[in-house]
């Protein structure tokens, strides 16, 4: 599986794994991080597979992101690419 780190002063991430997907509950703590999360969202909303990664914005400003199991690696790599994550490792 994957292990990742992030700046806890800027973002909080909790994940919930099911048999078909992983749901990430993301609380953004800075406007610069909010912009980076939106870049990840734009990337996945702009590709041709509309069900690979689904973003939902919550009223409190947090995000719920549902990622198909076969897309977790891609999601984490792009979160790292847009500097939402500090590191990723495979275990």
Segments predicted by a language model, with ranges:
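Short, charged/polar N-terminal "headpieces" of proteins
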Residues: 1-16
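Generic "edge-of-domain/loop-turn" microfeature
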Residues: 11, 31-33, 72-74
């Amino acid at each position: 599986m994957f292990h990742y780190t992030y700046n806890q002063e800027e973002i909080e991430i909790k994940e919930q794994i099911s048999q078909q997907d992983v749901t990430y509950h993301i609380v953004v703590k800075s406007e610069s991080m909010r912009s980076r999360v939106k870049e990840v969202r734009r990337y996945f909303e702009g590709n041709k597979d509309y069900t690979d990664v689904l973003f939902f914005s919550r009223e409190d400003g947090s995000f719920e992101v549902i990622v198909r199991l076969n897309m977790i690696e891609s999601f984490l790599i792009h979160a790292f690419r847009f500097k939402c994550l500090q590191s990723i490792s495979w275990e």
